[in-house]
UniProtKB/Swiss-Prot annotation:
This is Transcription factor HES-7.1. One of its GO terms (biological process) is negative regulation of transcription by RNA polymerase II. A motif (WRPW motif) lies at residues 174-177. One of its GO terms (cellular component) is nucleus. Residues 84-116 form the Orange domain. Residues 122-147 are annotated as: Disordered. Transcription repression requires formation of a complex with a corepressor protein of the Groucho/TLE family. Residues 13-70 form the bHLH domain. It is found in: Nucleus. Pfam families: Hairy_orange, HLH. Its main location: nucleus. It comes from the Eukaryota.
């Protein structure tokens, strides 16, 4: 059991640390508010925010107003989404052109892929650059995937098109904890 003399230095140490921790917390808050004031004064071109002595409440109110008004204005992401879709469409067209330029590609495979690629139109609201699927690691697939011949096209994780015929395949699911 600890004696009373051992506990008191710990309490005294905590009492000394408490104001230091509080001072650091206030410094962080004030630094963040100052950065926010500068950002808002540049974004809103507000004269009252250019004054470094502006109240903290005023900075926070301007921030709320800025965020509310930015929700109402159409975002540049809508324009970016259209650019993404046109790029995606261009990529599909390039893939079709490349595939059709290969005379040695199996006719059934070429017809199937041409039909799939030409019929694909991404929904306008569903696709955006931030929604693109992330590539999955291929570590778990290296040993489990069968080697495909030159006239074989993998259509989905469970089906393969071989000379115009579907053949079922099974892949082991990659799990990072295994």
């Amino acid at each position: 059991m600890k004696g009373a003399s051992e506990v008191r230095p710990m309490e005294a140490h905590r009492k000394l640390l408490k104001p230091l921790v509080e001072r650091r917390r206030r410094e962080r808050i004030n630094n963040s508010l100052e950065k926010l004031r500068i950002f808002l004064s540049q974004a809103l071109k507000s004269e009252k925010l250019k004054n470094p002595k502006v109240e903290k409440a005023e900075i926070l109110e301007c921030t709320v107003q800025f965020l509310q008004s930015s929700k109402l204005v159409p975002q540049d992401g809508d324009v970016g989404n259209k650019g993404y879709q046109s790029g995606f469409q261009h990529c599909l067209e390039t893939a079709l052109h490349f595939m059709n330029s290969k005379p040695d590609l199996n006719v059934a495979t070429k017809d199937f892929l041409s039909h799939q690629l030409s019929s694909y139109k991404p929904p306008a609201e569903a696709w955006s650059p931030t929604d693109t699927p992330k590539p999955t690691p291929s570590i778990g697939y290296q040993d489990s995937a069968p080697h495909l011949s030159s006239n074989t096209i993998s259509v989905s994780p469970t089906k393969t098109l071989v000379d115009g015929q579907f053949s079922p395949q099974t892949f082991q699911t990659w799990r990072p904890w295994v």
